[in-house]
Design a protein with these regions (language model features):
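Catalytic Walker B motif of ABC-type/P-loop ATPase nucleotide-binding domains
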Residues: 170-173
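Conserved catalytic motifs of ABC-family nucleotide-binding domains
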Residues: 166
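Helix-to-loop junction immediately C-terminal to a conserved catalytic motif
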Residues: 52
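Conserved ABC ATPase "signature" region
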Residues: 67-68, 111, 115-140
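Conserved ABC ATPase signature
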Residues: 145-149, 153
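Helix N-cap at the start of a conserved alpha-helix in ABC-type nucleotide-binding domains
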Residues: 181-183
C-alpha cells in the first residue's frame, strides 16, 4: 500500500544559516498515530510545516496521496492543504470572534472567500460546526468569544476547526505544550478518537515521552534535523532516551487524566 505521506531527503536551511532538517526520509501510512519527539530546535515543527508547505523546503520532496507537495502551486496546493488539518501550539484563533466563526473558518479551503462563508454559510456547514463542537464538548459555547475560553477549550476549538476541513491527515504542532497535565490528556484523547474512530492519520509533535508512549502507535525522534529513532513507543528505553535528549536528561511523567474541562 502506498504511503499517505512520503518524505525523501528533506532539507530546510533558514536564511540565518540554521539547518533545521538535514536529509529526513520517512513514510507515514494511513491511520497511523505518529508522535514526533526531540529537543527544542530538533526540527519537529519545521518538518510538520514542510508537509503542508507552510515552510518551503530547501531541497528534497514531500508527497501527499501521491502528489508532489513541493512542486504544487495555486489551486493544486489549495486542494492539498484543505485535506491536511493543522492544530497549533498557540491555538491560532481569532480571539475577538465567536467560537462559531472560528470553527466555520475551517471551510475556507472549500469556498472562494471568507466573506462568502461568513455571510452565507450553508445549512450543512452550520450543522457541521455544531457537530464538531459537540465532539469536543463545547457546543454550548458556540456564540461566545474565543478569548473567553480557557486554554484547553481554545485548543478544542482548534481541533473542531481542523475537522471542518474533512482532512485525511491531521498535523498537531505541540498541541499541549501550554496546557496543564490533566488538560493535556483531555486534548490528546480527542486526537486519539479522531485517529481511531475517523481513521484520520495523525502526526503530532510532543515534548513529553510519557504522552508519546500513551497515545502514539509509532514514535519518530529528531535530533539535529535528522531521524534518530523510528519505531514503537515501547522500544524507547533509558538508553535510547538519553541518545535522543542527552545524558543529563530526566524523563518527566505526565500524570493520569482527570479531564477537568469535560
Amino acid at each position: 500500500m502506498a504511503a499517505l505521506v512520503s518524505v525523501k531527503d528533506l532539507v530546510k536551511t533558514y536564511p540565518n544559516g540554521t539547518r533545521a532538517l538535514d536529509g529526513v526520509t520517512l513514510d507515514i501510512q494511513r491511520r497511523e498515530f505518529v508522535v514526533l519527539i526531540g529537543l527544542s530546535g530538533s526540527g519537529k515543527s519545521t518538518l510538520l510545516r514542510c508537509i503542508n508547505r507552510l515552510v518551503e523546503p530547501t531541497s528534497g520532496t514531500v508527497t501527499f496521496e501521491g502528489i508532489d507537495v513541493t512542486r504544487a502551486s495555486g489551486a493544486e496546493l489549495r486542494r492539498i492543504r484543505r485535506r491536511i488539518g493543522m492544530i497549533f501550539q498557540q491555538f491560532n484563533l481569532v480571539k475577538r470572534s465567536s467560537v462559531f466563526a472560528n470553527v466555520l473558518a475551517g471551510r475556507l479551503g472549500y469556498r472562494t472567500t471568507w466573506r462568502t462563508i461568513a455571510s452565507r454559510p450553508t445549512r450543512l456547514d452550520v450543522m457541521h460546526v455544531f457537530e464538531n463542537l459537540g465532539r469536543v464538548g463545547i457546543a454550548d459555547r458556540a456564540f461566545g468569544r474565543a478569548d473567553a475560553l480557557s486554554g484547553g477549550q481554545q485548543q478544542r476549538v482548534g481541533i473542531a476547526r481542523a475537522l471542518m476541513q474533512e482532512p485525511e491527515l491531521m498535523l498537531a504542532d505541540e498541541p499541549v505544550a501550554s496546557l496543564d497535565p490533566a488538560t493535556s490528556h483531555s486534548v490528546m484523547k480527542y486526537l486519539e478518537e479522531i485517529n481511531k474512530k475517523d481513521g484520520i492519520t495523525v502526526i503530532c509533535s510532543l515534548h513529553f515521552l510519557s504522552l508519546a508512549r500513551r497515545y502514539g502507535t509509532r514514535v519518530i525522534a529528531l535530533k539535529g534535523g535528522r531521524v534518530a529513532f523510528d519505531g514503537l513507543p515501547a522500544d524507547i528505553d533509558d538508553g535510547r532516551f538519553k541518545e535522543i535528549y542527552g545524558e543529563d536528561a530526566v524523563e518527566v511523567e505526565i500524570g493520569p487524566s482527570r479531564d477537568p474541562e469535560r
